[in-house]
């Protein structure tokens, strides 16, 4: 058997169940980061006793990772946003089918494994299931949700799709009240509109732009990994990569013509 979190849910969406993928991904990431810290710093520096470390490792090996697929059976149409009946999607609930939720819901909590975590990039089946999940959810949503989706599509290496959502996120919205089902954009002062105002959308959109230009995960720095085709030339300076590397890029005709990587901590860089 595996260890699962009891009585969890996919935030603001659907039923309560044990072993919710969102919670499992969070817990697995916590254990994984803890063990990586121990490998780098040593258990003593981390304040972990030998027996505690053994227990952490035992639990880590048995944690349900919250990464499973199901098949889209056409309940919302034979084809929705390019997802066809029979295509695989990532499970949002461990036991309930995707139809337990709302098509087009603003939250995509089981997508944490793609961004901000990096748990499925090296698994083609899960990666494809995740992109199908994003397609099925749709693009237009609340302001903060579109900010997250920009990052998700950038991490999925689809710069044009990320740019399409960026354009939606930058459309003008002028109105009162609260809309949980769409209508997001920006106000004249450039504050993100859920609606109402939520700073998450501003931070998310700018993070998404950075994610299109520079990514760092799995010990690697990726230059222009999700460059939109409309950004044929440009310049970006001072981007931070994991490990305290500072990256600057100039590109022309969709190709980098100048790359500068400053190693701020003297760490290995290949």
PLM regions and their residue ranges:
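Aromatic- and carboxylate-enriched substrate-binding clefts and catalytic-loop regions
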Residues: 1-22
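A general structural signal for short secondary-structure junctions and capping/turn motifs
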Residues: 2, 18, 104-106, 213-214, ...
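Short, well-ordered strand-loop elements centered on a beta-strand within folded domains, enriched
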Residues: 3-5, 221-223, 255-263
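A glycine-rich phosphate-binding loop feature that marks nucleotide/adenosyl-phosphate handling sites
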Residues: 8, 53-61, 224-231
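Flexible loop/turn segments at secondary-structure boundaries
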Residues: 11-14, 158-159, 172, 230-232, ...
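Active-site core of glycosidic bond-cleaving carbohydrate-active enzymes
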Residues: 20-220
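Glycan-recognition and catalytic regions of carbohydrate-active enzymes
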Residues: 186-187, 217-248
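Carbohydrate-binding surface patches
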Residues: 244-269
